[in-house]
């Protein structure tokens, strides 16, 4: 099967994100080499991937047109980084979120790759200008930040280094679409990229509302899961504005003054105090106790919900 693969992709790091990338690329027909410095880590990752893909097959949620065995045959482990990158068209780094560790990995890769392979990082917050600083192949470098869990949530943020070649962005965008993901282009780097800036803005105000006793933690979550989240699963905040009036200009004419009035009441960045954290944790634990067993079960339920939502979205999305 590997001989007829769409191309060779290397995953550096065999944790949760690395395994998810491996499954996604295999679903698109790519040969996948999973690299890790620990041979046992690779063995564990391959076994976890097999179990996960079997479960996906049973649930009817396996991505791609290939069978589970065909996809599994495309994924292999490699403990030697030089051997792993041989013949690769794309390298996806997935090591822990540590700038110096990632820079060390990219420096090593930079010294052994050719001028055609794309070097991509899964970082959620490290700036490309720092991550890829000093690399010879900087024009081939890009951040491709997935959303956890990547197999069920398709968005990928593409964030270039200031010297990244436009062709690198275009190739990465096309590759993400080929494996069924939904890439978006961040035009220039900014702390937190786009997704986390929006997420942190929500968390900041949510924390403040709970801390000031305006709403309970559980009711705060209801506002998202049964309110805003229902809309945002299908349309974003800007299209919501557009549809909630006779277009965007009409919305701004009607509501901009009211929005500014409310926004002026927002306070400073919360301190995320221990006292409030304990209050929120107590409320959360009433729903999901924070022991490994209950957390794992809730994550599995979340992933099943996301799978079903993805199926629904594929059925109702406008052409």
Swiss-Prot record:
Pfam families: 3HCDH, 3HCDH_N. NAD(+) binds at residues 16-17, 36, 97, 102. The modification N-acetylalanine is found at residue 2. Its EC number is 1.1.1.45. It catalyses: L-gulonate + NAD(+) = 3-dehydro-L-gulonate + NADH + H(+). It comes from the Eukaryota. GO terms for biological process: D-glucuronate catabolic process to D-xylulose 5-phosphate; fatty acid metabolic process. It is an enzyme of class 1 (oxidoreductase). Keywords: Acetylation, Cytoplasm, NAD, Oxidoreductase, Phosphoprotein. The modification Phosphoserine is found at residues 3, 111. Disulfide bonds: none annotated. GO terms for molecular function: L-gulonate 3-dehydrogenase activity; NAD+ binding; protein homodimerization activity. Inhibited by malonate. The keyword Ribonucleoprotein does not apply. SUPFAM superfamilies: 6-phosphogluconate dehydrogenase C-terminal domain-like, NAD(P)-binding Rossmann-fold domains. It is found in: Cytoplasm. GO terms for cellular component: cytosol. Has high L-gulonate 3-dehydrogenase activity. It also exhibits low dehydrogenase activity toward L-3-hydroxybutyrate (HBA) and L-threonate. Homodimer. Belongs to the 3-hydroxyacyl-CoA dehydrogenase family. This is Lambda-crystallin homolog. It comes from Pongo abelii (Sumatran orangutan). The gene is CRYL1.
């Amino acid at each position: 099967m590997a001989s007829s693969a769409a191309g060779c992709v290397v995953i550096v790091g065999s944790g949760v994100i690395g395994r998810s990338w491996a499954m996604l690329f295999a679903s698109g027909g790519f040969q996948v080499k999973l690299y890790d410095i620990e041979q046992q880590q690779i063995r564990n990752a391959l076994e976890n991937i097999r179990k996960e893909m079997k479960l996906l097959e049973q649930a009817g949620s396996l991505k791609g047109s290939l069978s589970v065995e065909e996809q599994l045959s495309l994924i292999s482990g490699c403990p030697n980084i030089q051997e792993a990158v041989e013949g690769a068209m794309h390298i996806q780094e997935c090591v822990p979120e540590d700038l110096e560790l990632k820079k060390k990995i990219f420096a090593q890769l930079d010294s052994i790759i050719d001028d055609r392979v794309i070097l991509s990082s899964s970082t959620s917050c490290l700036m490309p200008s720092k991550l890829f600083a000093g690399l010879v192949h900087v024009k081939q470098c890009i951040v491709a930040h997935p959303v956890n869990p990547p197999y069920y949530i398709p968005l990928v943020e593409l964030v270039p280094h200031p010297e990244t070649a436009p062709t690198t962005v275009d190739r990465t965008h096309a590759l993400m679409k080929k494996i069924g993901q939904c890439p978006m282009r961040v035009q220039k780097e900014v702390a937190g990229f786009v997704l986390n800036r929006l997420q942190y803005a929500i968390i900041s105000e949510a924390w403040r509302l709970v801390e000031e006793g305006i709403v309970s933690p559980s009711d705060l979550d209801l506002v998202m899961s049964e309110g805003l989240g229902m809309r945002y699963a299908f349309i974003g905040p800007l299209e919501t504005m557009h549809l909630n009036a006779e277009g965007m200009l009409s919305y701004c004419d009607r509501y901009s003054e009211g929005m500014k009035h409310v926004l002026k009441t927002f306070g400073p960045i919360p301190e995320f105090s221990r006292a409030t954290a304990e209050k929120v944790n107590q409320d959360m634990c009433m729903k999901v106790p924070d022991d490994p067993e209950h957390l794992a079960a809730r994550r599995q339920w979340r992933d099943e919900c996301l799978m079903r939502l993805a199926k629904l979205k594929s059925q109702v999305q406008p052409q």
